[in-house]
């Protein structure tokens, strides 16, 4: 199974306090045939030096000459990726040790080209919640809500041709929609917690009205009928309210 190279795409920007833990979680993978492509997006702190502290030849540091955002950093890394499979990990998130081994095994055995998983939510290294995604996500289901965490995704690289991350808000969500629609496939949940998503100040204080506007904008590129677009946005709102109510009930305000 280790015959297949996995290219891990990691964008970074001013992540000196978290990127070492993220890279360490890759080094702990029980699946050994990988390359980690870290693309630094013109950081002003010591992020690049933190990456260079690791001597493993599978870790490759790339740099953008000027800040292009997460989409631009991921796209730069994708240009240098040579793996059969593509995985994604941000510079503040963490993988569990058998993530790649389990997911690649399931994908090969079941002919799955798009896999994601469940993840824990951490804040200051403490677990504050978890996200359990649907077992299968179709294109129409994805239009209602993005249940796919980028940090959990593994793709067959053929799905990315001709796609890359667009320079829009919610760029990962936009890419998943493009892939599922163009290939007429469903994404499949591996069924276990494979990653840890670290809450950042931006995610904690995100403006819900801005998120609604961004969701509306993304839907505009995929749903022509205005009434259908409203339908999908209402689904997005209802799912968000249910999630907020669940979090409030469980003390995760």
UniProtKB/Swiss-Prot annotation:
The source's superkingdom equals Bacteria
- Which GO terms of type biological process are on file? lipopolysaccharide biosynthetic process
Recorded catalytic reaction(s): these are: N-acetyl-alpha-D-glucosaminyl-di-trans,octa-cis-undecaprenyl diphosphate + UDP-alpha-D-glucose = beta-D-Glc-(1->3)-alpha-D-GlcNAc-di-trans,octa-cis-undecaprenyl diphosphate + UDP + H(+)
Instruction: Name the EC number(s).
Output: 2.4.1.305
The pH response of activity is noted as:
Optimum pH is 6.
- Secretion signal: which residues? none
Q: How does it sit in the membrane?
A: Peripheral membrane protein
Please state the pathway this protein functions in, per its UniProt record.
Bacterial outer membrane biogenesis; lipopolysaccharide biosynthesis
- Single GO molecular-function term? hexosyltransferase activity
Q: Keywords assigned by UniProt?
A: Cell inner membrane, Cell membrane, Glycosyltransferase, Lipopolysaccharide biosynthesis, Magnesium, Manganese, Membrane, Transferase
Task: Tell me which GO cellular component terms the UniProt record holds.
Answer: plasma membrane
Family annotation (Gene3D superfamilies): Spore Coat Polysaccharide Biosynthesis Protein SpsA, Chain A
Cofactor(s), names only, from the UniProt record: Mn(2+); Mg(2+)
Q: Which InterPro entries match?
A: Glyco_trans_2-like, Nucleotide-diphossugar_trans
Q: Where in the cell is it found?
A: Cell inner membrane
What is this protein's function per UniProt? Catalyzes the addition of Glc, the second sugar moiety of the O152-antigen repeating unit, to GlcNAc-pyrophosphate-undecaprenol.
Protein family: Belongs to the glycosyltransferase 2 family.
Q: What is this protein called?
A: UDP-Glc:alpha-D-GlcNAc-diphosphoundecaprenol beta-1,3-glucosyltransferase WfgD
